[in-house]
């Protein structure tokens, strides 16, 4: 199946929105570095696992935000332009990937 190419960017996002996503990812990156330090410093396993869970939740929130935005903008635009079936199929494929994790 050919992917929907004309909607592959975040061009519809404002600079502020992109900055918010980038800042969230930078915070998550810092959390991951903190976990790495915890491992290197032989911290208690449960404490490390709690932090890993927090990172997973933060990543899931970023992904859900992007997924929602994709549905509202990219998929909606594709439907309006008559290419909705392919965009919906692609969206469903992404949902399947999320439910596997």
Curated annotation (Swiss-Prot):
Molecular functions per Gene Ontology: DNA-binding transcription repressor activity; metal ion binding; transcription cis-regulatory region binding
Major location category of this protein: cytoplasm
Binding site for Cu cation: 45, 70, 74
Keyword annotations of the record: Copper, Cytoplasm, DNA-binding, Metal-binding, Repressor, Transcription, Transcription regulation
Compartments in which it is found: Cytoplasm
Subunit structure: Homotetramer. Binds DNA with a stoichiometry of 2 tetramers per DNA.
Protein name: Copper-sensing transcriptional repressor CsoR
Organism encoding this protein: Bacillus subtilis (strain 168)
């Amino acid at each position: 199946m050919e992917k929907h190419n004309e909607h592959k960017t975040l061009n519809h996002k404002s600079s502020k929105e992109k900055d918010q996503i980038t800042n969230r990812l930078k915070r998550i990156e810092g959390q991951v570095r903190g976990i790495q330090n915890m491992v290197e410093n032989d911290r208690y396993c449960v404490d490390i696992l709690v932090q890993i869970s927090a990172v997973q939740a933060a990543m899931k929130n970023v992904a859900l935000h992007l997924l929602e935005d994709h549905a509202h903008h990219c998929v909606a635009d594709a439907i309006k332009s008559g290419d909705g079936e392919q965009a919906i199929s692609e969206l469903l494929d992404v949902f399947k990937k999320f439910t596997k994790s």
